[in-house]
Amino acid sequence: MLSKQWAGWLLAASLGLGGFGIAAASVADAHSGHVDPRPAAASPGAARAAARYGGGAGRNAPKPIPVSGKDRVYTADQTSNTVSVIDPSANRTLGTIALGDQRLGAGLSPQYTGDVDVHGLAFSPVTKRLAVVSITSNTVDIVDTATNKVVNHTDVGRASHEGSFTADGKQFWVADRGRDTVTVVDAVHGGVLASIPVGAGPSKVVMSPDGKLAYVNHISLAEVTVVKVATHRPVDHITGLGDAFSSDEAISPDGKELWAVHKRVGKVSVIDLTHDKVTSVLTTGPDSNHPQFADTPQGKFVYLTVGGLDETLSFRRTDSGVPDATTAPATVIHDNGHAPHGIWPSGDGSRLYVGLEKSDKVDVIDTATNKVTGTIPIGQEPQAVVYAPLAAPAGSAAHLGSQGLDEQARNVPTTLPDGTAGETLDPVKGRALEATVRPVNGLDMIQLQARGLKPKTTYQAFSAGADGRKAAVVSFSTDANGNAPMVLAFSAFDGRSISLAVKNAGVAKATSFQLNRMHSGSANGAVTATDLLYCDCC
């Protein structure tokens, strides 16, 4: 049951779905194998684009680097505010880099100067530097991977999310969701070099393999904005994506293809970068998270984590750029935990490392068999994952600590208002109600996620003990689709499960009205603070 009940709750309800705005829309069911590819005919500006961008994009594809003790896997741990450091040659966690206090620590103090909500990662193989983005403190830390020490720290734009290094490793470009800009960080000395307007709600920056172009997706604009790195100017806008909300994206090693994921609708837009054209939109499943390309001994593939189904999908790439789902449906890899999120291949493509957001672990997947071969405990609530070949001296664990380790989450059973089990996994829709509990600073963080409940309804969640007694935990309201992507409460939790009941109808109506007003969006499509809360978890 609950004692010392403290703290409020955070509800980040799903944004409105909006329209696709796509001519000749193409949707593929990744599980069933149905695909209706769009024609990939060259756009009128294709030839001009090649000249404008300085040549083909596939010239700098990396060569395979065998797994060794000099490699590292990093995870951004949002609740413990750490970066977990893994030695992939032994598949063990060496320790964590603490960039701030664990949640409910000193972070509420006005004198606190640490990071809050460690979330995004990128690695430069040239300078051996790791960039770490914290989305609530709006900061970027540059870490020397040989020593695990922060070499500089920069305050960037509001709700900074994910980014990439330039080819020489001297700059780090990060998308600022709340400022409609990309901030260019001096990765050598720290500080802001420039701020580039790119359109509403930029979410992530990825670079072309030759380093000449930056591709920016958005959470409130159905396009990928193309920026010329040398001039800091947008040079193209790839439109026609499957949804206006794209949290994550990845570019292929040959620079010919980009996948932009639409988490809230469970889809992926596949983009042909030769013609700057969306070629297909795949239906992939609830909470589709991060895509990643990998050239393996078995061929060229794209992998995608689907958090709502506890799966990682594998797609074989084709010359046309459209996944051949008709003859080779996506391979489903069942993860060994809950909510797969970040993903990255080893330097030789023989393995994948997948962060399990609601299990505080990392799965190791053998790409030859598409099977999980190991699971590694790490810090709390992993988001981004990066594999860094030749990042540190073999056996080195310099300056690492243990913050966030040995405090793994547990997922407890749930009961819906009608008495049915909420944690039962529907193979298409996911779970109706998930409840994750993890220890934080002497209390428990109770995280709920609801899907497909009654729309615009206020629910009361209870902790249910073994003796049947209940204690109130938190109340929350669903959006127009019956979803509540993230609800947080902090208390001492000693129950066995979580149960739901519909709250007073009058209160529900008022709360739902306020929720709908907050998510109605402004006339100019600007990102609101409420919108940004949604992707505290993506």
Please identify what each model-predicted range represents.
Residues A510-D536:
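Short beta-strand elements
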Residues F493-L515:
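Short, surface-exposed ligand- or partner-binding patches at beta-edge/loop junctions that are enriched
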Residues L433, G442-L448:
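Structural beta-strand segments of beta-rich domains
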Residues M1-W9:
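Bacterial Sec-dependent N-terminal signal peptides
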Residues T457-S463:
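Short beta-strand segments enriched for Tyr within beta-sheet-rich domains
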